[in-house]
Structure formats: C-alpha cells, structure tokens
Amino acid sequence: MTDGSAMTLRDEARAKVNLTLRVVGRRPDGYHELESVVAFADCADHLTLQPGAALSLTTIGPGAQDCGDSADNLVLKAARLLGERVPDLTTGAFTLDKHLPVAAGIGGGSADAAAALRLLARANDLAVDDPRLIEAARLTGADVPVCLPSKPCVMTGVGEKLSPLPLPRIPAVMVNPRVPVATKDVFTALGLKPGSLAVGATDVLAAPAWPEAGAPLADWVVALEAGTNDLEPPALKVEPVVGTVLEALRATAGVQLARMSGSGATCFALYADDASARAAADALCAAHPGWWVHAGSLS
C-alpha cells in the first residue's frame, strides 16, 4: 500500500453516451437487460483525492448545487463498497468539481463513482481490473462498470458485460435542456413487467457486424443508424422537451445522426467534421440560450 498523504491524485469523469440502447427485457428481479453501444465524450467532471484523510466529499463547480446531499453521492458509496472488500483501504478527502448536468442520461454520477474507484486503486496500488474493484463498481450502480474503463464498447446484461469496440473519434454535439429526468420514471413509463421480454420470440439477439478498426466514419454512422434508443418513446412521455431537443439537433446543418442518450434528457448529434459540430453548437446556443450545449467528440 502506498502512503499518499502528501500528494493529491486527479482524474476525469467523462460523460457516457449511449449511441444505441436496446431494452431486451426485464429480469424477474426487476433489473432490465440491455444492449448498448457506449462511447465517452470529451466533457467531464473533475475529481481529486487527498489520500490519508478521513473519507469525505466536497462538491464545487457550476453543477454543485444540483448534486444534493453529499452523503448520498455515488463517490462515497463506491469508496465504502471498496473498503468493505479491501482490508485497510486508504481512502481520503475527495473534491468533485461538477460540470456535467445531473439526471441527464450521460452517467454523470456513475462516471464520478468510477473515477473515485480509479483514484482509490492508484492510492492503494490496486489494478483497475482487480475483481474487488469491479464488484464495488457493479454494486454502486448499473452504469459504473462501463465508466470504470471509459472506453468504447458494446454493453450487455444489466451493464456488467463489456465487449471492446474500435470506435473512431466522432465529432459530436451534446445538448441537455437543463430538465432532469429520473431514470426510474422512464423505465416505469416503458412498462415492462418483471420476467417479460421486449423482443419477439423470432427476434434472435446477435451482435451486429460492427465496422473493423480503421473503417471510415461513414461506415460507423450507417451501422449506428440501424440501432435505436428504446427509451426515447417513454422519455418523451415523461418529459416532452426531449422531442424539442431532437428536432433542434436534426435541423442543424451537416447532422449525420441525432438520438437521445440513456434515459434522457441529454441528446447527441454526430457530424462528419469538427467545424460542422462547432457551427451546429453555435446555432443551438443562439436559438436556445438556456440549454447546456457541448461541441466536441466521442471516442
């Protein structure tokens, strides 16, 4: 174990984006089985750890007031779960600089928790693939395992099965109308009963033939267009402004694909180049000054 009392460790909690999201069904225990292509954006929260101090969390930044009670934060939950599995775990004082919108379908809280686990792994000389770390991630929340590596993948099961995907860097715009959407409300609106399938008996579940490494961006757009986000219709029932965001994105010049991420309300659009993404973001900011808009890339 490393005595890290004199150093501050830093990590980024990158936003998670579901490029596709298919709800396969609902297990008897109530959890939903999913198939999702996941990428990560170049916008993030920032987390620091001062190892050796008592476990604590201070939240700062433009999104701090939206985080609620620090005692309920997933950063502390993840740290405590790891502490239950690693004897004499060195924890410390976390500071979360919150920039990503909350309850937004981009895994902000899950990304924060995953960053906390990565920082604790560094402070305690643990490998990021240590089974205890992975178990703590799984028990913290369904999106935490995919955020732990924060790399493009196909996510299946209830979020714990990850298959790497050679996704290229994709210019993109992300938009959130600053309206929180509770994941629980969206799944309730979906209305699947425990033990039921969302696919027909003749619908054979198989991994799509995704483009190989080095394939042009256009090939990936075509492959992603064949997918859906099954949570879009119920999210529109819960918060109709999602439809307004999608319409605005689909009306931008040069848009290749626009879709909702996760359970919303954040939506994204893909573009052929950075200039198109930047121009689209500028237009959206001008037309909707109250929205959160980010131009960057997914990878």
From Swiss-Prot:
Binding site for ATP: 101-111
Active-site feature positions: 16, 143
Keyword Heme among record annotations: no
Top-level EC class: transferase
Pathway: Isoprenoid biosynthesis; isopentenyl diphosphate biosynthesis via DXP pathway; isopentenyl diphosphate from 1-deoxy-D-xylulose 5-phosphate: step 3/6
Keywords: ATP-binding, Isoprene biosynthesis, Kinase, Nucleotide-binding, Transferase
E.C. numbers: 2.7.1.148
SUPFAM superfamilies: GHMP Kinase, C-terminal domain, Ribosomal protein S5 domain 2-like
GO function term, MF aspect, one: 4-(cytidine 5'-diphospho)-2-C-methyl-D-erythritol kinase activity
Catalytic activity: 4-CDP-2-C-methyl-D-erythritol + ATP = 4-CDP-2-C-methyl-D-erythritol 2-phosphate + ADP + H(+)
Keyword set includes Transferase: yes
InterPro entries per record: GHMP_kinase_C_dom, GHMP_kinase_C_sf, GHMP_kinase_N_dom, IspE, Ribosomal_Su5_D2-typ_SF, Ribsml_uS5_D2-typ_fold_subgr
GO terms classed as biological process: isopentenyl diphosphate biosynthetic process, methylerythritol 4-phosphate pathway; terpenoid biosynthetic process
Family of this protein: Belongs to the GHMP kinase family. IspE subfamily.
PANTHER family from the UniProt entry: 4-DIPHOSPHOCYTIDYL-2-C-METHYL-D-ERYTHRITOL KINASE, CHLOROPLASTIC
Known function: Catalyzes the phosphorylation of the position 2 hydroxy group of 4-diphosphocytidyl-2C-methyl-D-erythritol.
Protein name, as recorded: 4-diphosphocytidyl-2-C-methyl-D-erythritol kinase
Organism annotation: Rhodopseudomonas palustris (strain ATCC BAA-98 / CGA009)
Taxon lineage: Bacteria, Pseudomonadati, Pseudomonadota, Alphaproteobacteria, Hyphomicrobiales
